């Protein structure tokens, strides 16, 4: 089984695919993003869709493709090429999209009629798309993402504490995620205010840069930090490439998303690093965090109640250690990379034509 991969631009992924033997082609794939949700944007996407359709169709014929695999609902052209050539189509679904309603309905229709199987990254994602169009016989299967737990927790601790001049007496509570309305940076700051009033030694670290077009949110976040008098208490590190090193020094990891996050891999990375996790109770988080065993699930719209849930973890180091150990065991048992690979390969094999 050989793979030809189409990517929309040059970047580190090209080298990663080539390293494992895949052939890579750079093709503008008419990726559907929120910034194109306008009459002009839809015209732009339609033009690039037709170009991508032509290029991909030519490529599929040249390599005698047996199957098309699309790795996001934001790329529609793979489904069209597969349909036009009579090829099986596997669609990997990472998104929970509620609005615009017309887009959600169109994507739901496409999933029903333009793929042999959809692979949802979580049961929450599967439920969302199954419920979007009431019809029996779902084509969607759930396959959890996997990570190599052995790559986490091996970094030397102390790097972050040294960088921020924090002692072992400081409790580091951190979040990692790109800046966006629903990623919860502002909610994290409000939680920080509640916790810091009771535990002055707590420090709060935010890691992650902004999605393109959302850089203006930095102003809102830092204005809130100032208004709550948390300068020096909440520390924004921006983009970092050394996430495993940072996680090692976190005492508590927080996922404060205010909208359902399909399956946030960073939660698995924190658990693999033996960190207790606090996550808002919706989306894929509820399938990753076992409430009261590997961490706590909190509301996404009530920082007072969230603080009352989190406080025992802030207060009790032994509880944090117990949750962290249980979290790592859960990652190794349920979210292993080897299991993920095996399930994906099996699905693809099921839909490849049998050799004659």
What kind of region is each of these model predictions?
Residues 213-218, 231-240, 246, 296-297:
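Active-site donor-binding acidic/aromatic loop of nucleotide-activated sugar
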Residues 171, 175-197, 204, 304:
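A conserved mid-protein helix/loop that constitutes part of the nucleotide-sugar donor-binding site
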Residues 153-166, 221-223, 343:
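A short helix/loop element that forms part of the nucleotide-sugar donor recognition site in Leloir-type
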Residues 12-18, 205-231, 319:
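Short, structured helix-loop element that forms part of the nucleotide-activated donor/catalytic region
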Residues 159, 305, 312, 319-334, ...:
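A short, well-ordered alpha-helix in the C-terminal region of glycosyltransferases
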Residues 291-292, 296-304, 312-318:
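Conserved acidic donor-binding segment of nucleotide-sugar-dependent glycosyltransferases
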Residues 124, 146:
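Carbohydrate-associated surface elements
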Residues 276-279, 289:
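Short hydrophobic beta-strand element within catalytic cores of glycosyltransferases
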């Amino acid at each position: 089984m050989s793979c030809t991969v189409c990517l929309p631009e040059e970047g580190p992924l090209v080298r990663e695919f080539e390293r494992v033997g895949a052939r890579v082609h750079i093709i503008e794939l008419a990726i559907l993003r929120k910034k194109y949700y306008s009459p002009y944007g839809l015209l732009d996407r339609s033009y690039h869709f037709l170009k991508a359709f032509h290029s991909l169709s030519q490529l599929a014929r040249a390599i005698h493709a047996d199957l098309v695999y699309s790795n996001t609902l934001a790329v529609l052209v793979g489904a069209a090429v597969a349909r036009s050539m009579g090829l099986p189509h596997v669609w990997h679904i990472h998104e929970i999209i509620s609005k615009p309603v017309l887009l959600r309905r169109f994507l739901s229709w496409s999933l029903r009629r333009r793929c042999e199987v959809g692979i949802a990254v979580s049961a929450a994602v599967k439920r969302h798309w199954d419920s979007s169009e009431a019809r029996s016989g779902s084509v969607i299967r759930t396959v959890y993402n996997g990570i190599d737990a052995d790559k986490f927790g091996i970094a030397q601790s102390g790097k972050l504490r040294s960088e921020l001049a924090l002692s072992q007496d400081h409790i580091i509570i951190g979040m990692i995620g790109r800046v966006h309305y629903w990623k919860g940076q502002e909610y994290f700051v409000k939680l920080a205010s509640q916790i810091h009033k009771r535990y002055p030694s707590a420090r709060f670290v935010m890691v992650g840069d902004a999605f393109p077009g959302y850089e203006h949110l930095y102003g809102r976040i830092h204005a809130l930090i100032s208004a709550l008098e948390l300068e020096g208490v909440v520390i924004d590190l921006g983009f970092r490439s050394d996430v495993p090193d940072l996680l090692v020094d976190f005492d508590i990891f927080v996922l404060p998303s205010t909208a359902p996050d399909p399956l946030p891999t960073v939660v698995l990375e924190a658990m693999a690093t033996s960190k207790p996790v606090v996550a808002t109770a919706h989306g894929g988080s509820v399938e990753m965090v076992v409430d009261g065993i590997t961490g706590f699930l909190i509301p996404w719209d009530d920082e007072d109640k969230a603080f009352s849930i989190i406080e025992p973890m802030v207060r009790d180091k032994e509880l944090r250690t117990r949750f962290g150990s249980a979290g790592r065991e859960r990652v190794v048992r349920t979210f292993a990379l080897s299991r993920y690979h095996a399930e994906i390969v099996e699905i693809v094999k099921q839909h490849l034509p049998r050799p004659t």
